[in-house]
């Protein structure tokens, strides 16, 4: 995996050409994806061009190699957490999103009570689903805007921390996540993979349980698409050394 310093030396491309390439269904090189993500995160690519590229990805998809490069580049847009000094098993659970889904709020402290350590970086509302961060912020005084140092300190003290993407932690996902929310590209399988896995790998965890929703309250209403997402999340995540278990659960009615 390249260093952040190497990422800053990414060669330049013409954004319109990259949009045309993906619109035609062609595969991006790793260098092209590095340029796209790094330049957008730094504000060098405007929202309207990034939105066009996201829509091209939404229609044409990405190969596993492209998705791996997407995850890696988003991950390296910021710092990653070093929890290697914590000897307990470090795990997390992530849901792909549904209506009324509050499982993380209950499951995380239960996992800690069972002896695990849970460093959880979550997202905000996306599409019609409510985000874990939004739910946490409804609790008076709950701070989800944690620096890397604050996040690690909470994990060390309590075995659990819950926060969001920041300027330090996966800033590329924070920007792209917000743009996907307003460009009708929330249900793109490779973009979902990039968002979820970049956050989870940045946590420094050993294992991840993925709750892939299916049904009319999920991003992917079709079971076969949900199965495809679960398989790609597992394939790409395991290439980064994560132990992953994916379960597909029904989202045809609100949870709780």
Language model: regions and residue ranges:
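Glycine-rich anion-binding loops and their surrounding alpha/beta cores
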Residues: 10-13, 18-21, 27, 76, ...
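Glycine-rich phosphate/pyrophosphate-binding loop regions near the starts of catalytic domains
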Residues: 89-121, 181-190
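A glycine-rich phosphate/pyrophosphate-binding beta-strand-loop-alpha-helix module
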Residues: 31, 54, 102-152, 156, ...
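Electropositive phosphate-/nucleotide-binding environments in soluble metabolic enzymes
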Residues: 12, 27-34, 44-48, 61-68, ...
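Acidic, glycine-rich active-site loops and adjacent beta-strand->loop/helix elements
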Residues: 95-97, 124-128, 214-216, 252
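Acidic, glycine/proline-rich low-complexity segments that act as flexible tails and inter-domain linkers
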Residues: 2-100
């Amino acid at each position: 995996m390249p260093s952040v310093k190497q990422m800053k030396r990414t060669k330049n491309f013409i954004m319109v050409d990259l949009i045309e390439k993906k619109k035609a269904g062609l595969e991006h090189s790793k260098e092209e994806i590095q340029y796209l993500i790094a330049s957008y995160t730094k504000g060098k690519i405007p929202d309207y061009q990034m939105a066009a590229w996201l829509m091209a990805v939404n229609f044409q998809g990405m190969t596993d190699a492209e998705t791996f490069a997407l995850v890696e580049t988003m991950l390296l847009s910021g710092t990653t957490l070093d929890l290697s000094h914590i000897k307990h098993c470090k795990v997390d659970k992530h849901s792909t999103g549904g209506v009324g889904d509050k499982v993380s709020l209950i499951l995380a402290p239960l996992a800690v009570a069972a002896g695990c350590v849970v460093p959880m970086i979550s997202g905000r509302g996306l599409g019609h689903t409510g985000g874990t961060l939004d739910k946490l912020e409804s609790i008076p005084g709950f701070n989800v805007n944690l620096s890397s140092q604050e996040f690690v300190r909470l994990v060390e003290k309590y075995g659990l921390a819950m926060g969001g993407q920041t300027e330090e932690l996966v800033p590329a996902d924070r920007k792209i996540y917000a743009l996907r929310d307003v460009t009708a590209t929330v249900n793109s399988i490779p973009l979902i993979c990039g968002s979820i896995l970049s956050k989870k790998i940045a946590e420094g965890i050993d294992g991840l349980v993925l709750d892939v929703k299916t049904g009319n309250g999920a991003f992917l209403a079709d079971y076969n698409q949900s199965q495809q997402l679960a398989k790609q999340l597992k394939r790409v995540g395991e290439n980064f050394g994560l132990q992953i278990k994916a379960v597909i659960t029904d989202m045809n009615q609100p949870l709780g």
